[in-house]
Amino acid sequence: MKIKDTLNLGKTAFPMRAGLPNKEPNWQKDWADATLYEKRQELNEGKPSFMLHDGPPYANGNIHLGHSLNKISKDIIVRYKSMAGFRAPYVPGWDTHGLPIEQQLAKAGMKRKEMDLLDYLEECRKYAMKQVDMQRSDFKSLGVLADWDRPYLTLLPEYEAAQIRVFGKMAEKGYIYKGQKPIYWSPSSESSLAEAEIEYQDVRSASIFVAFKAKDTKGKLPEDVEFVIWTTTPWTIPSNLGIFAHPDYDYSVVAVNGRKFVIASEMLEAVAEKLEWENPEVLQTIKGSELEYMVAKHPFYDRETLIMNADYVTLDSGTGLVHVAPGHGEDDYFASRKYKLPVLSPIDNRGYYTDEAPGLEGLLYDEGNKVVSKWLEEKDALLKLEFFTHSYPHDWRTKKPVIFRATPQWFASIDDFRQNILDEVERVDWVIPWGKTRLFNMVRDRGDWVISRQRAWGVPLPIFYGENGEPIITPETTEHVAKLFAEFGSKVWFEREAKDLLPEGFTHPASPNGEFTKEKDIMDVWFDSGSSWNGVLNERDYLSFPADLYLEGSDQYRGWFNSSITTSVAVNGVAPYKAVLSQGFVLDGKGRKMSKSIGNTIVPKDVTKKFGADILRLWVASIDTESDVRVSMDILSQVSEVYRKIRNTLRFLIANTSDFNPKEDAIDFAELRPVDKYMLVKFNELVKQIRTAYDNYSFMTVYKSIINFITNDLSSFYLDFAKDVVYIEAANSPERRSMQTVMYVILKDLVKILVPILPHTAEETWTYLEHEPENFAYLAEMPEAAEIPGSEELLGNWQEFLDFRDKILKALESAREAKLIGKSLEATVTIYPNEVVRTLLTAIDENVAQLLIVSNFVVANEPVNNAPESAMKFDDLAVLVEHAAGEVCDRCRRTDETVGHNANEHLKMLCEHCAHIVETEFPEILEEGFED
């Protein structure tokens, strides 16, 4: 037998190298084979519920890191809640209708206008389902557990039926109407857009100052005055029908170069500088209210331009007079309604001028800027043309500019229940406080919701028309359509004639002959996803409404958060969520948006292949997701180093509890060694912190707390001296079993705590905890913090001891630098303490030499002031470090004067303590001795 054979060296097959990319797919297969998600749900049957409702990602293309951030975050929450005593089903969803899928078909050579509509819709469906399958596989590879076999898809018949019922309820309450007013129009996709489908990009545009000659000034101004406007959309001048002045502003008539111009008095200096007017003479000042109902002439068409009043006119830029084209601006439209101006919008679906703009027919609207400017110049109405860069709305799908264009559309009126939505916004728990302000302002300021789209792939608007063109939407018709959709899917709308989509025997005064037609437009996809509270939470009996949490990217304040609360308040009077948490965007390591053109994109699959999903998950836990976050392969490499610390700690704990059976070997708390009590109480505090952090969705706090505990409490202190106990002491000694008791509790509960973040690693570790009854760590319960009497005093004492230890370590380091010692085990430490330190050492009642990893620790009877000159002085003690007397023990490596003095020749190389252990545990050595 060798000396090392008398040591309790930790043994484990738990590998130091994780090999996550190779192992994780096997774990995911094991979870699926064991129906782990379902088993956890069964365990929690009858417990309080927690509903995290999944916002549906769009079914198009591989997932990106933003998807990963979102799905991993949700999985962390659901796993935690499930282990914390909640029934927390997680039903993933997909948004499966809309323009991007039509665009993908177009790229593949399938053109909607050249195909049978039903064939085209089937191709859309097949493409969407293929994308769902692909993304589902991607999400599973991240370790996300969910009801993957029963997701919700916005194209499923039962979902479409539920959506129709939401529409029907809103129509029944009078919120749905058809109107013609300016809305965002995308010429590139030939469809209307909602505000949520708009993104802004910087563009270079022309701006012009235009003079409109007066026709009738009501005798209040000279008849030869000209009203000056400024616009950034010259192409809308053909649609001009009026000019707005603010009723409360003063306007000046100025004489310049033989002409008389009207502009806001406060803007005169700025405009004069811009137009290079020299010494403009103010002839007259008049209130804006006096300008109302004056008439000007259109610059190049034979029609009138009405001067009107509007409060929204500002003096931030321009002239204080605003060009009005009711067919191309929302403010223009609403403010001019009281003047009964017609809505002129001479632009077609593709963005080309119609014959309502004579001379411009067939010209693209953007090309109209040049022609209009030329015409104005010829009429001497163009005072200045210049170019500037500004933020302009674009179609978020095609990335092309959009315009405001008045077209017949279906709208959801928000005004009738806007205040109800705002009241609900106030009631919701916004995990990020500014989220409330953001959504509140959006709801407060938004116009009516344009819900119709001129596309094919989507849920049809369940609207019929009578013989006289009157729209027909009744509870009877919408419910009948909902039932048809539930049975056949929405394709039935395109398969059947209108009469075959109506209830049998249906009659309506608008169709005395019983003839009907049907709406051709489909619904905005935001109405699709915005109805998910009904299509999912209300439709599935194991879910409940409202959801406890909606968690999505910060772009969803204008999107899903907004559309969901709008439809839910309209129908139910309440928000569909109790709490909302948003996340920032994922940027590259330099803080730039990820873009294929820059070449800085990181694909989740590349991360999982190189590092493993657990590293990506640990990164998610390590960041503040409330704002934009950065990621790069270098950052992920740093995260993998942190992971290595966690893994090595788990491995050490497994190895050193491998011969520990908690049922037989555990020590009661009261009998634990003082330092072990401290570590158990310290870990109990960690559990308390982590439970609170998980409850608050603060993953970064969970991460930091765990890493801090592993690094500072375990690695730098407890496990640093642990080898002197678990390796050296007798296998079944109280000292060793005391420490193993604490190690086992920490190991077991730390694994449970890690399950939500590192599920693959946690489950791998769990297989080494053979005494735990659950087959999977995920089936265990989350540890709860215990109430331990006297814990505050104990923590206080030990914090003071650790401060004391820092001073000793500083003195040891100084001695090492002075070559007095090599390793700390070569040292004898003598301290000269004040009474406070003496009291502290008495209170902790410990083997201080062992905790400090020195051979001897001596408390001198002398006070601090009597310490030798060579001692390191502190306020409350002096520390003298000397080389320990004696020889090094071949077993524990301590320097001890008893080494070499044992009566038994075979034990002479051991200190007295080790010799006693060997004598007791290995009596054969007394006769046989050790091998060389």
UniProtKB/Swiss-Prot annotation:
Domain notes: IleRS has two distinct active sites: one for aminoacylation and one for editing. The misactivated valine is translocated from the active site to the editing site, which sterically excludes the correctly activated isoleucine. The single editing site contains two valyl binding pockets, one specific for each substrate (Val-AMP or Val-tRNA(Ile)).
PROSITE patterns: AA_TRNA_LIGASE_I
Native organism: Lactococcus lactis subsp. lactis (strain IL1403)
One GO BP: isoleucyl-tRNA aminoacylation
Homology family: Belongs to the class-I aminoacyl-tRNA synthetase family. IleS type 1 subfamily.
The UniProt record lists the keyword Transit peptide: no
Quaternary structure and partners: Monomer.
Gene: ileS
Catalysis performed (reactions): tRNA(Ile) + L-isoleucine + ATP = L-isoleucyl-tRNA(Ile) + AMP + diphosphate
Residue sites binding L-isoleucyl-5'-AMP per the record: E552
Protein name: Isoleucine--tRNA ligase
Motif ('KMSKS' region): 593-597
Function field: Catalyzes the attachment of isoleucine to tRNA(Ile). As IleRS can inadvertently accommodate and process structurally similar amino acids such as valine, to avoid such errors it has two additional distinct tRNA(Ile)-dependent editing activities. One activity is designated as 'pretransfer' editing and involves the hydrolysis of activated Val-AMP. The other activity is designated 'posttransfer' editing and involves deacylation of mischarged Val-tRNA(Ile).
